[in-house]
Regions:
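Conserved SAM/AdoMet-binding glycine-rich loop
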Residues: 17-20, 27-31, 45-124
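Radical SAM enzyme [4Fe-4S]-AdoMet core and its adjacent flexible, acidic
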Residues: 5, 13, 28-49, 58, ...
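N-terminal juxtadomain amphipathic helix
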Residues: 68, 302-307
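Residues at or immediately flanking beta-strands
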Residues: 9-11, 62, 93-95, 154-156
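Flanking scaffold residues of small Cys/His-coordinated metal-binding clusters
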Residues: 9, 13, 17, 307-311
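Terminal, non-catalytic domain-edge segments
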Residues: 322-333
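Recognition helices and adjacent regulatory flanks at domain boundaries
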Residues: 1-7, 20
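Local cysteine-cluster metal-coordination motifs and their immediate loop/turn environment
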Residues: 19-27, 310-321
Length: 333
């Protein structure tokens, strides 16, 4: 598939912790109880330096801090890791995705000094945002974003669209421009399984219901079809971008989609992966070089032309849901 010297991009999950309770996030069951397979963990600066030496950092063109389960602003050493990367690779493109509802004003100003592009998940205005981004504070997010932007930070506004907030798209776009965001994006989520999504509390009581936009609804059939396909050939996004994914527990995979350990036991993708690949390599047990030399990545690419992998077919097969979900608008400010 690729060698360690080929890697130019890293998608990095610094923590699996988060203060929010977004209903469609896999951390929780419909926003209620924690996922029983979730391991709460985070990667410190010390551990990061042990796993990724300076020579490896220097070969990277880009570094994206996000992940499947946590939010970077909850981790202790997020800023320090960005400082480490900027110090040893002045030209690296640094990005982070966050709900933006934590950390102090000085912290955000310091982050801006590291030339990190920050994508804020802001799903509407003050009256609609927290319907999905439960346990986040819209006013605090805007305050943090303004502090970041005022110190020269490159901020982007990402808005997930539902029935309850689609009437605010234009207002959010205009506000994002007024506040100094460089880009405004809308995302029609593909996480609906049918025409509604029930939000649960910690006792499995339904406390709210989310409804899809017509665009999200139109993707339900496409996603179901993609989940059933096992294609002999795919166009691997991770390979095409020379990317590596690292989870907060230290597990390594080509992309965030193959980080399947936290998935429920009945997951078709997880069971298919375990049957065919049989391992989740981890930096707590082996060095990065040892994992690359183990043949793990070759196992994955060999599967594409033999048995196929369900998750690979789903994410990089005939239906490109990543591109279908997003519409991006660049501001000239």
């Amino acid at each position: 598939m690729y060698n360690i010297t080929d890697i130019r991009s890293m998608h990095f999950e610094v923590t699996s912790k988060c203060q929010a309770k977004c209903p469609m996030c896999p951390r929780r069951i419909n926003g209620g109880k924690l996922n029983p397979n979730l391991i709460l963990d985070e990667i410190t600066l010390e551990k990061f330096g042990q796993w990724f030496d300076i020579d490896f950092v220097k070969q990277l063109d880009s570094f994206y801090m996000c992940g499947n389960l946590g939010d970077p602003i909850v981790a202790k050493d997020t800023l320090e890791i960005f400082q480490y990367l900027r110090k040893h690779n002045p030209k690296i493109y640094l990005r982070m995705h966050t709900n933006g509802s934590a950390k102090s004003i000085p912290w955000w100003k310091n982050l801006a000094e590291q030339k990190v592009t920050v994508i804020f998940g802001i799903d509407g205005l003050a009256d609609t945002h927290s319907k999905y981004r439960i346990n986040t504070d819209w006013s605090k997010i805007i305050e943090n974003a303004q502090a970041f932007i005022s110190n020269g930070g490159d901020a982007r506004w990402d808005m997930i669209i539902f029935k309850h907030n689609e009437h605010q798209i234009d207002e959010c776009r205009i506000l994002s421009n007024q506040l100094g965001f460089k880009e405004f994006s809308i995302k029609h989520t593909s996480r609906f399984k049918d025409d509604k999504f029930d939000v649960l509390d910690n006792h499995n009581n339904i406390i709210d219901t989310l409804y899809p936009t017509s665009k999200s609804k139109s993707m339900i059939t496409k996603v179901k079809k993609a989940q059933e396909e096992v294609l002999p050939m795919i166009s691997c996004k991770a390979k095409n971008q020379s990317e590596l994914y690292v989870s907060a527990t230290g597990s390594i995979s080509p992309c965030c989609w193959l980080d399947l350990e936290w998935m429920p036991e009945q997951s078709f993708s997880k069971n298919d992966y375990i049957e065919k690949i049989k391992e989740f390599p981890n930096l707590n047990n082996s060095s990065l070089k040892e994992i690359f030399n183990s043949g793990y990545f070759s196992k994955i690419s060999n599967c594409w032309v033999t048995t196929g992998l369900k998750e690979c077919s789903k994410q990089c097969g005939s239906f490109d849901k990543l591109n279908e979900q997003f519409i991006r608008i660049t501001h000239e400010n």
